[in-house]
Structure formats: C-alpha cells, structure tokens
C-alpha cells in the first residue's frame, strides 16, 4: 500500500454499473485533506469529449486527476470512438513519461460499449460483470452493487444504493452524489436472458 501523504487529497468513491441498456457512473462530492473535509460538493464524475459520449470519474489527487482527464480527452480526439485504444495509449504514457509517472490518481471511464479502470501502474482493466468501483469506499460500493445486480432494480438505483452504503462506512465518502448516465449496448449475458 502506498504511503499516506497528509498534504495530498485522498479518498472518494466512484462506481459504474451496466444494466438494462444503461451505464451509470456515480461519485461522491467529498474532498479531504488529511483528516479535514475541505469540500463536500466536488464533481468527480463528468462527461468527456465534444459529444459527451464518454463518462469519467476519478479518485486520488485532484490536480493529478484533472491532468489525466485532459490527456484522455486528447487521446479520444486522436482515436475517436475507440475508448479502449485511447485508454491503452494514455496508460502507456502514464507509465513511461517521467512527469506523468508521479501522478497519484485512478480513473473509471465508460462509453456505450465498455467500462475501464486506469491506474498509474499501467493497468487498463475491464470488469467481468459490468460493475467497477475505485477509491477509498470502492470496495464497499462494489460489494453492495454486486449484491444488488440480480434484483429487479435499474442501473441508477443500484449505483445510488451502493454509494449510500459506501458513504455510511467510508469516512472519505459523503452522500452528495454526481451521477451521469449513458445509453449502453446490452452485454452478451443480458441479450441471452
């Protein structure tokens, strides 16, 4: 586990859920500096690109995350409608560029076809079940969403319930959520049902 640096803003919860032809990404609004809550209504989930066809959420150092979001937007311009390729190219840069290597953040990104997590270690990960979460409350939200995914609930309801559970457990997560939704292609599993 990385050493905790008190002068860097840590902690948040970001989750994405794919179900029923929708992809939903939700993030809390708390920004913490060490043990102090600095802001309660930050927007850590946003749309990218001119068309807004990609949604992204970040956890980690805020300035670092914004740098990575800008880089991802540039990659999306280079590789339009190719989220996986844009993310792989960003991950390569993030891993090999001397400046980018120092950035402390993680990102979740999604479009109508795919959801991916990007890390500073060069990882570009796709969830098996259409659910992925990052941040200090990520494991709580992920567990809750997986428990709810087979229930008769839509993607947004699952994301909200999972975020509420994370907010009740994780001290770095609050219940002021930003939620973005996209129409999504049905997964092969959903098509079979």
Curated annotation (Swiss-Prot):
Catalytic activity: ATP-dependent cleavage of peptide bonds with broad specificity
Organism of provenance: Bartonella henselae (strain ATCC 49882 / DSM 28221 / CCUG 30454 / Houston 1) (Rochalimaea henselae)
Function according to Swiss-Prot or TrEMBL: Protease subunit of a proteasome-like degradation complex believed to be a general protein degrading machinery.
Positions bound to Na(+): 167, 170, 173
Gene from which this protein is expressed: hslV
Assembly behavior: A double ring-shaped homohexamer of HslV is capped on each side by a ring-shaped HslU homohexamer. The assembly of the HslU/HslV complex is dependent on binding of ATP.
Regulation: Allosterically activated by HslU binding.
InterPro entries: ATP-dep_Prtase_HsIV_su, Ntn_hydrolases_N, Proteasome_sua/b, Proteasome_suB-type
Active-site residues per Swiss-Prot or TrEMBL entry: 12
Alphabetized GO MF terms: metal ion binding; threonine-type endopeptidase activity
Keyword Nucleotide-binding tagged: no
Protein name: ATP-dependent protease subunit HslV
Gene Ontology CC, one term: proteasome core complex
The protein's Enzyme Commission number: 3.4.25.2
Pfam families referenced in this protein's UniProt entry, alphabetically: Proteasome (PF00227)
């Amino acid at each position: 586990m990385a050493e905790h640096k008190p002068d860097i803003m840590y902690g948040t919860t970001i989750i994405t859920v794919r179900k029923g032809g929708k992809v939903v990404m939700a993030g809390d609004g708390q920004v913490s500096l060490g043990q102090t809550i600095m802001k309660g209504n930050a927007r850590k989930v946003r749309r990218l690109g001119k068309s807004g066809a990609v949604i992204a959420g970040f956890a980690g150092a805020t300035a670092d995350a914004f740098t990575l979001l800008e880089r991802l937007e540039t990659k999306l311009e280079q590789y339009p409608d190719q989220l996986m390729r844009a993310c792989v190219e960003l991950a390569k840069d993030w891993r090999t560029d001397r400046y980018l290597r120092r950035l402390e953040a993680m990102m979740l990104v999604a479009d109508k076809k795919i959801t991916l997590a990007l890390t500073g270690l060069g990882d570009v990960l796709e969830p098996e079940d259409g659910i992925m979460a990052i941040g200090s409350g990520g494991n709580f939200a992920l567990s809750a969403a997986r428990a709810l995914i087979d229930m008769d609930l839509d993607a947004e309801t699952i994301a909200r319930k999972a975020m509420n559970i994370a907010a009740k457990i994780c001290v770095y997560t609050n219940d002021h959520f930003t939620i973005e939704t996209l129409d999504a292609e049905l997964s092969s599993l959903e098509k079979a049902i």
